[in-house]
Amino acid sequence: MSKYLIYTCCFHQEIYTDVVSNLINSFKKSGSTADFLVYTTTQYKEIIQAKCPDANVLFLEKNFYKTMNQARISKLDIFDYPGIEKYEKILYVDADSLILKDPECVFDSIQDDVVYVVGEGNILNEGEYWGRSLFLKENPEYTDREGMSAFVLGFKNIQTIKKLFIKIKQSFYLDMYQNKLRFYDQPFFNFYLLQNKMCNTETFKSLARSRPTPEIALKDGLAIVHFAGCPGHGNVKLELINEFKSGLVVATPSVVDTPSVVATPSVVDTPSVSVANETIFLLQQQLEEMRQKTAQLEELLRKQLNQ
């Protein structure tokens, strides 16, 4: 039995079973000896098992998570898994990701009693993606600093982390009923992990990254790549994943056999790309707010027509 656990979540839309299948297959090819867990519904479990019949995957089932908000915060339920006490270290990976090599190097880098994440963006960015309103509510004079992405979370199996996850989840659901959520779970992870000084935002930068080119991913020896953008749109995710995989075939015959190299500064880290990513996130937020307003107007019209 492995002392390491990797897990992901699959709820809300059936097309994400295809997205998760890509992640599972990439994990298998990596040669990892870690256990792999999918948190999903009974229906999606059966679909995933049919798509990945040879994968030795564990499952945690919950059948009443239906909305995007529930899907996004489900990653915090990991301590509900009955066998969780068996593991020393745990690694969450977003479903819309690929594992390019044995993630043991990722587990080895988890040394302190904090959550390891990938630092990105700035917490006071107007796009709200990194928790601007939460930080300013705490302190209107809050000093800007680097934010973080929750697409990968590495941590030890300790009570401190479990209690922190419970606190984040409680705050998330309270806000969901009282206010309009912006970018789902991401702002809450930023606020609680950074405010409580409970995260390492540097170590994973050389191991995991969002949307690198295949060439840069191989050159920098990345273990995990994430296909950020368009949350809830599985077709877009699959297009991004397939495009990346095609690029990998051109770049190298075998990802698993590619020797890792020390990460070096690349075009992904340049300010121009960072600004572009922030612009993308801002546009996504605006589109989501427009979608919500349209739904509210449609509901209002239906009520008026039924009067």
Name the predicted role of every residue range.
Residues 1-66, 83-86, 228-237:
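N-terminal anchoring/stem segment of glycosyltransferases
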Residues 6, 27, 79, 96, ...:
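A residue-level signal for conserved active-site and pocket-lining positions in enzyme catalytic cores
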Residues 18-21, 73, 77, 183-191:
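A structural signal for well-ordered alpha-helical segments within the folded catalytic domains
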Residues 24, 28, 107, 169, ...:
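Non-transmembrane alpha-helical segments in soluble domains
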Residues 38, 143-145, 149, 155-260, ...:
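A glycosyltransferase accessory/donor-loop signature
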Residues 71-127:
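GT-A fold catalytic core of metal-dependent nucleotide-sugar glycosyltransferases
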Residues 108-171:
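Conserved catalytic core of nucleotide-sugar-dependent glycosyltransferases
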Residues 292-307:
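Helical coiled-coil/dimerization "stalks"
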